[in-house]
From Swiss-Prot:
Family the UniProt entry places it in: Belongs to the TRAFAC class translation factor GTPase superfamily. Classic translation factor GTPase family. LepA subfamily.
Source species of the chain: Prochlorococcus marinus (strain MIT 9515)
This protein's GO CC annotations: plasma membrane
Reactions performed catalytically: GTP + H2O = GDP + phosphate + H(+)
Function summary: Required for accurate and efficient protein synthesis under certain stress conditions. May act as a fidelity factor of the translation reaction, by catalyzing a one-codon backward translocation of tRNAs on improperly translocated ribosomes. Back-translocation proceeds from a post-translocation (POST) complex to a pre-translocation (PRE) complex, thus giving elongation factor G a second chance to translocate the tRNAs correctly. Binds to ribosomes in a GTP-dependent manner.
Identification of the protein by name: Elongation factor 4
UniProt-listed PROSITE patterns: G_TR_1, G_TR_2
Protein keywords: Cell inner membrane, Cell membrane, GTP-binding, Hydrolase, Membrane, Nucleotide-binding, Protein biosynthesis
A Pfam family reported for this protein in Swiss-Prot or TrEMBL: LepA_C
E.C. numbers: 3.6.5.n1
Amino acid sequence: MTDISVSKIRNFCIIAHIDHGKSTLADRLLQDTGTVKQRDMQDQFLDSMDLERERGITIKLQAARMKYKAEDSQEYILNLIDTPGHVDFSYEVSRSLQACEGALLVVDASQGVEAQTLANVYLALENNLEIIPVLNKVDLPGADANKIKQEIEEVIGLDTSNAINCSAKTGEGIEDILEAVVSRIPHPQNEIKSPTRALIFDSYYDPYRGVIVYFRVISGSINKRDKILLMASKKHYELDEIGIMAPDEKQVDELHAGEVGYLAASIKSVADARVGDTITLFNSAAKEPLPGYKTANPMVFCGLFPTDADQYPDLRESLEKLQLSDAALKYEPETSSAMGFGFRCGFLGLLHMEIVQERLEREYDLDLIVTAPSVIYKINLNDKEQIFIDNPSTIPDPQSRESIEEPYVKMEIYSPNEFNGTLMGLCQERRGIFVDMKYITTDRVTLIYEIPLAEVVTDFFDQMKSRTQGYASMEYHLIGYRKNDLVRLDVLINSERADPLTSIVHKDKAYGIGRGLVEKLKELIPKQQFKIPIQASIGSRIIASESISALRKDVLSKCYGGDISRKKKLLKKQAKGKKRMKAMGKVDVPQEAFMAVLKLNQ
């Protein structure tokens, strides 16, 4: 396998927005080069998780090695490295771009350039990749290739005179793409003599062999008898096997600079082989790791609780297993008086959170309650100390803190300009600060806002899509913390604080949200034998209150007629019982009530 010269290797990836046909195009390339036999072919071949196929998104990276005989009758090795297109996974994208020399920029010929595509194109340009524009879905009746070419030139500044028109569905233009990959993407640098360095661009957990690491050799070579060192985690391993993905794993003896492959070395967890880490040889280690490694930090937090308390050990076990294959997931145990035992989990973003939740429910058969998502707040205490908190119910009381700062993001929204008004309205409702508005083409516009992350993580994305009939797309990145007039809003049920419903809100919005919460709870909590007050409070001040009236048992039903003093005695006894009940009684809030309130539009 390794007698191929570096000049015959091409490493490339596909950059595309969700739904622009990236996975279908990858299927066609695998099929046309004969990498996957016709009978084994299934749609979205590289998307190995059911969830990926269903949602039509790529979550975990995959890689495939194809052999292609070009028109110059030379045989080339093409390594396709698949990338996720969603904003939550931008770090994963940046690393897979580092493993390539070129990229196919796939744009739907009926829809045009979208926000996440743009973000990834800029990442590719930063990594000096050769970009080949490809217009997909040209067979659709609504496709207008020339208009989209012009848009790519105006928005990204790429020359589209030699852009390729293709339809991954019908197979038109696939040959042209393969030829372009060979002729336009540069071959890897020939650094076989330098010290060995390889970049990890993906890893997954295999229950039998431990972590399988996908890597690209940047310089030097790796032999299956070598002992390797991972430079960021400082751990060393004996190799069990190395090989290539074609696209099923195939063992080889050695991989040289420029090649892409996998290795297994009985690595216990994905956290030991982090994406972006550098592999080198234990005996002759490289001096410097490859640049750009950073640990992915969670931005969104929420509590996960099993609906059935007996499932707590199962939840813990399944989170441990998930973390083996998802290094960005963080979790720690948490207890709540209302929900019992559960975990506080950190995610890269909302999509990541939904996917983890869905995988827990689907792959591990758990029934979960998820508390409202929150972000990391910076609390400035009176003694000038700063603390970071991701759980609103643990924020100190107003007397002991000076101010609360919250993370802000810079957001770019791309949309047809007829939706301008409604999008600007949405951003203003979410406390966004207008920065700029640019017309990309005569009918497409970019809105740039600075907006608190907490306002984005609830349901901003859904709102944006529904207000623009699905045409708008967005991408955002953190720009730092800012002070705001924020307060902790507590919900008290029968004078006891319900932790899962605690949230941090802006002072101006506190009354509206508090009012909504208590009204919703009043509908949902069943009546008890005594009166239950439900209150929303900021500190010690109650800002909204409702009460659920008591159920009344008719204690007089058995005295027909009879003496009035007998009736008074029974009523007095009942009143006394209710008073005792109110003091002793606990209100059992059904979990449906929590669920409904958490779904209540933020």
